[in-house]
From Swiss-Prot:
Organism taxonomic ancestry: Bacteria, Pseudomonadati, Pseudomonadota, Betaproteobacteria, Burkholderiales
GO BP field: Gram-negative-bacterium-type cell outer membrane assembly; lipopolysaccharide transport
Organism: Burkholderia ambifaria (strain ATCC BAA-244 / DSM 16087 / CCUG 44356 / LMG 19182 / AMMD) (Burkholderia cepacia (strain AMMD))
Assembly and binders: Component of the lipopolysaccharide transport and assembly complex. Interacts with LptE and LptA.
Gene: lptD
Full protein name: LPS-assembly protein LptD
Family indicated by similarity: Belongs to the LptD family.
Statement: the UniProt record of this protein carries the keyword Membrane: yes
Length: 786
């Protein structure tokens, strides 16, 4: 007896008009009753909707996932031009056949579905969609709900991650795992001829773990093989995954050709390790390991590299960098900052290979400390040591230091506090004074603030006690134990006026803010005190309203002076943005300052200080400007100036122009500065960007540092090239040496990327630089819903 056809009244036979007809085969449960409804609505949309026919489906306002109840089986839906089969057993469909069950969809010219085994056999233009992954090929055989089976000659696409490729065969293990034989993979979104792809004898994909593995993989770029490995792992979505990272290339005038082959270990979501062998043509093979870790209570980075038997230096070279932050709770914390190199010439020889070292660095800090912060209390206990490379002069180390601060605000209108500090100073320089110092600095201030004024009188004391265990031969008669007590009284007051003005067709609020700051500190002889941590303060708008002209606790300048300043601002009343600011200030002396940094310096003898003038503008269309001048009226000389202009009308469009001038740099190297600086990032075409920096010393007629690069941004790859001339080391006379390097960086979007220093150089050299966009954001699994 022939099998009874399904729905004989719905499909009258081959003689019916050839229009698309629907066979709704509900094979999941007996009686043709659906196991679960997949369109669950809310609100007005959840109300019963009138249907045009018994076989119409109600439309849902959005695509949603609704899990089945425990033990329930999803219904099976079949759409085709022609169907036949046995009720509750099997179904054959021909002509634009489509089978849906749960999340799985099978489309083909013809298919056969067995209800008992949940097995679907599809032939001709087959498409299988499950969990956001689609496969297309001539033939497929699979268990629909379990998504287990195989397809021949498939083309595949991961809708969520954007990856795609083809193979001779794919074996589907479940809804997340699949194995491809003799296939390809790419994250390029182009349908044909991808810019880069991986070709391998076998691919194992796990979309749940977001990981792909290629056996005998070869990475092609523009049809050219650029890398091969018997085992390649890579992320499917561009997220962090263990595996090889793209190699990087550079050419350095000191080291020759450099090639890096980094391997990334994604140990845990909060820990990773990168091992980077670096081939340096002139020196050998350097190995670097960088470990990063993060937790709710601590974080840090530990990086170390080692170059055995440097062929140029004829010795082993290494560098170590460790930065750690710890939160113990209850206001207690700790930290470690450790930076060390193997020898004096390491920075200039190998500094370009380290992101935490530059070629001119001569001081390396090695410090560990404990902190406490709770309310008004702040405590620091630390041990600090310095590694000093010539020609720098070694600073004093604190071995150890204990610093305690207490600060209270607005207690009956008073602000008061104190700082207590104990330090034991040690130094590696021979014949230098060493010893202990205790400092206690209390203060009290009373501030009166109103809508348009403020008045703040303040009294503070400086107490210091020295216990020196070794005296320099230059000061053999100085006492080893002595104390200092120095009071300071200051009075700070100002007014704030404002008015509405209209300039250039725009409304502004203009302020006028005069300010007077008076400070008195009596003279105390401090020539016996060594210079443990003290230097001359810079002189500018940030320092002109400070009581002491020195930084540190070994010198307190005597003072009887008043500072007069005037500030005017122009504020946009709609947004509150400050569009312009102009400042002028000067100090006037009632007595000469007698305290100097050392006995060689002459006391300050003048009626007033240099004049300080500054201006800042922030106009429309991305234009900004900051300018500052220090002018000596007695000598009619410009002592210091800084002029800067910035223009950034859009993303990745920025131009900076600056000029720096210093007649005499007494706090650094006593050398004048007369430099012109220009930097920019600008698009040349829709995809090509130019990046550059040029810093020229007008006094020495030489390039201090320069950078010129190009970046090309394609849909699924980016290429950057750059040439950089940079300061690298300091000679015995204190002048900077220079080196040149060439860098090239290829980024394969959707695979992985690593910076070989090119992007870091662009970002450091061009204020406002914006990196090229990464791969487009992943799509939803419903983006290409079928």
């Amino acid at each position: 007896m022939p099998p009874k056809p399904l729905f004989p009244n719905v499909f009258p036979g081959d003689g019916a008009p050839r229009k698309r007809r629907l066979a709704l085969a509900l094979l999941a449960v007996p009686g043709l009753v659906p196991a679960v409804s997949y369109a669950q609505l809310s609100g007005a949309a959840a109300q019963p909707q009138p249907l045009d026919s018994p076989w119409d489906l109600r439309l849902a306002p959005q695509l949603e996932d609704h899990p089945l109840k425990d033990g329930a089986k999803p219904a099976a839906f079949v759409i085709a031009d022609h169907t036949s089969g046995t009720a509750e057993q099997d179904l054959a469909a021909k002509g634009s056949a489509e089978l849906r069950r749960g999340d799985a969809v099978v489309k083909a010219d013809a298919l056969h579905y067995d209800q008992d085994t949940d097995m679907a056999d599809a032939y001709g233009q087959v498409r299988v969609i499950n969990g956001g992954t689609s496969f297309a090929g001539p033939e497929a055989h699979l268990k629909v709900e379990a998504n287990q089976g195989f397809m021949t000659a498939p083309k595949y696409h991961f809708n969520v991650t954007g990856g795609s490729g083809s193979a001779e065969r794919v074996d589907l293990l479940d809804s997340e795992r699949s194995v491809f034989v003799n296939g390809t993979y790419t994250a390029c979104q182009c349908a044909t001829d991808p810019a880069w792809y991986i070709k391998g004898s076998r691919f194992d994909f796990d979309t749940g773990a977001d990981e792909g593995t290629a056996r005998n993989g070869v990475l092609f770029f523009q049809g050219v093989p650029i890398f091969a490995s018997p085992w390649l792992t890579f992320p499917l979505s561009g997220e962090r995954r263990s595996g090889l990272l793209p190699p990087t290339f550079s050419l350095n005038s000191n080291n020759g050709f450099e090639l890096t082959l980094p391997y990334y270990f994604n140990i845990a979501p909060n820990r990773d390790l990168t091992i980077t062998p670096r081939i340096i043509s002139r020196r050998g093979v350097q190995t670097e390991a960088s470990f990063r870790y993060l937790s709710p209570t601590y974080s840090g980075t530990l990086t170390a590299n080692y170059l055995p038997d440097d062929r140029l230096a004829h010795r082993n070279r290494y560098a170590i960098y460790w930065q750690h932050q710890q939160n113990f709770g209850g206001g207690f914390g700790g930290y470690v900052y450790f930076n060390k190199v193997s020898d004096n010439t390491y920075p200039e020889d190998l500094g370009s290979t380290n992101e935490f070292i530059n070629g001119t660095q001569t001081l390396y800090q090695q410090e560990a400390g404990l902190t406490y912060n709770n309310g008004p209390w702040s405590v620091l206990a630390r041990y600090q040591h310095w590694q000093t490379l010539p020609p720098s002069i070694a600073p004093y180390s604190r071995e150890p230091q204990l610093n305690v601060k207490y600060t209270k605000y607005n207690v009956g209108g008073f602000d008061f506090g104190a700082e207590a500090d104990y330090s034991r100073f040690r130094i590696t320089t021979a014949d230098a004074t060493e010893g202990d110092r205790i400092v206690f600095n209390p203060y009290i201030a009373y501030g009166v603030y109103g809508p348009g004024y403020f008045v703040v009188p303040k009294v503070q004391y400086h107490f210091a006690s020295y216990d020196l265990n070794y005296l320099s031969s230059s000061t053999p008669n100085s006492p080893k134990r002595f104390t200092e007590s120095i009071p300071t009284v200051s009075f700070d007051t100002g007014l704030i006026f404002d008015r509405s003005v209209r300039l250039f067709g725009q409304d502004f609020i203009q302020t006028l803010e005069p300010r007077l700051y008076y400070v008195y500190t009596p003279y105390r002889d401090q020539s016996n005190a060594p210079l443990f941590d003290t230097a001359e303060s810079d002189f500018g708008l940030a320092e002109i309203y400070q009581p002491n002209t020195f930084v540190g606790n070994d010198r307190i300048a005597d003072a009887n002076r008043i500072t007069a300043g005037l500030t005017s601002r122009f504020i946009d009343p709609r947004t509150g943005d400050e569009r312009a600011r102009f400042v002028i200030a000067q100090q006037y002396y009632f007595a000469n300052q007698r305290v100097t940094l050392n006995s060689v310096q002459a006391p300050v003898q003048a009626r007033h200080s240099d004049l300080i003038v500054g201006a800042a503008l922030k106009l429309g269309s991305g234009f900004m400007s900051e300018t500052a001048f220090q002018y000596n009226q007695n000598n009619n000389q410009l002592v210091k100036s800084s002029i800067g202009f910035g223009f950034s009308p859009g993303e990745r469009r920025v131009i900076n122009v600056g000029y720096r001038y210093t007649r005499a740099n007494t706090t650094l190297d006593n050398q004048p500065i007369n430099q012109f600086l220009v930097s920019a990032q600008w698009p040349l075409t829709r995809r090509l960007y130019a990046v550059g920096r040029f810093n020229y010393d007008l006094a020495a007629n030489r390039v201090v540092d320069g950078l010129l690069g190009l970046q090309y941004d394609a849909d699924c790859w980016a290429l950057g090239v750059g040439a950089q001339r940079f300061a690298n080391g300091v000679n015995s006379s204190g002048q900077q040496n220079s080196s040149t390097r060439f860098m090239m960086q290829l980024t394969l979007k959707g695979l992985s990327s690593i910076d070989n220093g090119l992007v870091a150089a662009f970002r450091a050299g061009v204020p406002g630089y914006t990196a090229l966009p990464s791969a487009p954001p992943p799509m939803s699994r419903f983006s290409n819903y079928e």
